[in-house]
Amino acid sequence: MNRLKKGDDVIVIAGKDKGRRGVVKSFAKGGSLVLVEGINIVKKHIKPNPNRGIEGGVVEKELPVDASNVAIFNPATEKADRVGYKFVDEKKVRYFKSNGELVDL
């Protein structure tokens, strides 16, 4: 179960961008892939197509990373953290497991 949401500040815990931080932009493949702003940037070679008005060249593009390779970033501890759920005032909220602070304020 993926406990991330769009707009969460995450840190990459595995892969070529390990240690870098970014914000979750979207999810793909039912939540198993996460598109993170500024992470997993690759260069794509685009073929020109004058009929569509596409100019050819090399374009940098963000690709999604597996959700298991990112963790939510806890600003209080400055480290990656895990997320749990609990009820506060009959409302389900997320909290950081290391210090118990709420993620959703």
From Swiss-Prot:
Keyword rRNA-binding: yes
Disulphide linkage map: none
A GO BP annotation: translation
Keywords in alphabetical order: Ribonucleoprotein, Ribosomal protein, RNA-binding, rRNA-binding
Keyword rRNA-binding annotated: yes
GO molecular function list: rRNA binding; structural constituent of ribosome
Domain of life: Bacteria
GO cellular component, one term: ribosome
Protein family: Belongs to the universal ribosomal protein uL24 family.
Complexes and interactors: Part of the 50S ribosomal subunit.
Function recorded in the entry: One of two assembly initiator proteins, it binds directly to the 5'-end of the 23S rRNA, where it nucleates assembly of the 50S subunit.
Matches recorded under NCBIfam families: rplX_bact
Protein name stated in the entry: Large ribosomal subunit protein uL24
